[in-house]
């Protein structure tokens, strides 16, 4: 990987109301594996010796930075990936500790994606299963869909995130490869079901090909989930018909 970051967990107990139940809210802070690079320092780059520490900690310093500039967009994408990857890898850690086969991941865990901010969970879970655990693609896809659910809170365009392809490929090249593969398989099913309807194929694609090419995160979340809903019955119907 181009950059390695440590995810440091912080747990807060959440007490139930008038019962003996307490759940755990786990939040994450980003840190660099090494706080000081002596090799860079000894080459005379004194500020560069702490660059990795600063850039790593910036990931969780300020949530949702201004994304008008490309630097803000990049930091937002890093934040979303950090949350998703740290949480999913933590689930695999628990799975291993309890000696549960990876094929039963979906029996132990359910991940709820509220809006598109955590939608990278689809391709990151596939990466962890296929690349790290060597699970066959079809089995990994079944586990992924059974593990994930998506709630859409609004259909306003600004809430349906689309990441520029150039930025996505620079920061998450392997994940983009996985998205391409998911998209190819999904669109093949669409073409079979809706013969002679290229407009529908283009609308449902995970990649927006009009203008500046971009990854449609809402489409990715829908395709990778076993359950999709809105915040009300009417909203759920709009998600079904419009999204």
Residue ranges of model-derived segments:
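A conserved ligand/cofactor-binding region detector
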Residues: 1-243
